Regions:
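Short, surface-exposed, charge-dense and proline/glycine-enriched linear segments
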Residues: 71-72, 102-111, 150-156, 168-175, ...
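A generic structural-conservation signal
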Residues: 73-74, 160-161, 228, 235, ...
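A short mid-domain helix/strand-loop element embedded in enzyme catalytic domains
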Residues: 117, 121, 171-216, 227-237
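Amphipathic, alpha-helical segments enriched in basic
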Residues: 5, 39, 84-88, 98-102, ...
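A detector for short metal-coordination/catalytic motifs
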Residues: 199, 203-214, 220-221, 231-237, ...
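Donor-sugar nucleotide-binding helix/loop cap in glycosyltransferases
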Residues: 1-183
Length: 329
């Protein structure tokens, strides 16, 4: 998988829901004719109404080149390794995997949509909050719209009025992706002034990896900090599941089942040393004793305090179900 994924995604000609159809046509033309650049530009002009600008056409061709759908060999264009793979497979699962491997942010958008419908302005904010390296101007929605339209064209997202929602296929992808993409080599950019950074992201208790884009989505939703300890360094934060990863696989990618905790506080939570109730108040195991000033100050001394996490970020039934398993509560 490319370690330096593309930050810019370009739209295809033909309309918002026809990106894949256009991609298929381009790949078929290239595979059949191995055209020169002039022939490829001419084919675009003859295939799409109101398309004449060479620069506009070549911007799309260069994107496909960067993503390795097509390669230029001498004066001619041929299918690249990705173009060959997708053409042979011919299914949307393969195309989505390829697009996620080569572009920043598509998986995190699918995760975010699993929490509920989003307007295009909300999509834009989500992408910038989760992936600040994308770098477009906040408030602009063109780049966000291109990402949403690629997912629409592949059948994983649909538009209802002014909102974007997951399709059934989108839900299937999200439910599996949090574990299947755990070995992705992408990680969020770290400020060069930081002396510490985490190259892999594993939970403390079970040494379990999750998809880095799922992790980035969770940290973004929780303001990049642990609400118990105040730790705000990304390399020291974990994705903590209310209903456990191992016992409730159907809720692994459910954003209303996770919160950001420091590695130490994640371990304490998973061991039942503290929990939170449906009002987001801290509840502490009466048997929990410690000589650690940090644990005393951040957990024991805060018994009954309401922690600062976004309203309705956790499903009350998940919290109730988790707490029902704690004999001391």
């Amino acid at each position: 998988m490319p370690s330096d994924r593309l930050r810019s995604i370009v739209p295809m000609f033909g309309g918002a829901t026809r990106y894949v159809e256009t991609l298929d046509s381009i790949l078929q033309f290239v595979a059949t004719h191995e055209p020169s650049t002039a022939e490829l530009v001419g084919w675009h002009r003859g295939s799409f109404a109101n398309v004449s600008s060479r620069d506009s056409i070549m911007r799309r061709v260069q994107y496909l080149n960067q993503a390795e759908f097509v390669n230029q060999e001498g004066s001619y264009w041929r299918l690249g390794p990705v173009g060959k793979e997708y053409s042979e497979a011919g299914d949307m699962e393969t195309l989505l995997r390829i697009m996620c491997e080569r572009n920043v942010g598509l998986r995190s958008l699918l995760y975010a949509l699993s929490a509920g419908p989003m307007t295009i302005a909300e999509v834009s904010d989500q992408q910038l909050d989760t992936h600040p390296e994308l770098g477009w101007t906040r408030g602009e929605t063109d780049m966000a719209k291109q990402r949403a339209n690629w997912l629409r064209s592949m059948g994983f997202v649909e538009k209802n009025g002014n909102e974007y929602v997951l399709t059934a296929d989108g839900w299937v992808f999200v439910e599996d992706a949090v574990s299947t993409w755990a070995d992705s080599d992408w990680s969020p950019p770290v400020n060069e002034s930081d002396e510490m950074h985490a190259g892999t992201y594993e939970t403390t208790v079970h040494a379990r990896s999750v998809d880095p884009e799922f992790r980035a989505t969770v940290l973004s939703r929780h303001d990049q900090s642990c609400p118990i300890s105040g730790v705000d360094h990304p390399g020291l934060l974990d994705v903590a599941h209310v209903l456990s990863w191992s016992d409730y696989p159907a809720h692994r990618a459910d954003l209303s089942n996770v919160l950001a905790l420091s590695k130490t506080h994640h371990a304490a939570f998973d061991r039942g040393l503290f929990t939170i109730d449906v009002d987001y108040r801290l509840r502490v195991n009466p048997a929990f004793e410690t000589e650690s000033d940090v644990l005393q100050r951040t957990i024991i001394d805060r018994e009954g305090e309401r922690i600062s996490i976004p309203e309705e970020s956790l499903k009350p039934q998940y919290v109730t179900q988790h707490n029902s398993s704690l004999a001391w509560l």
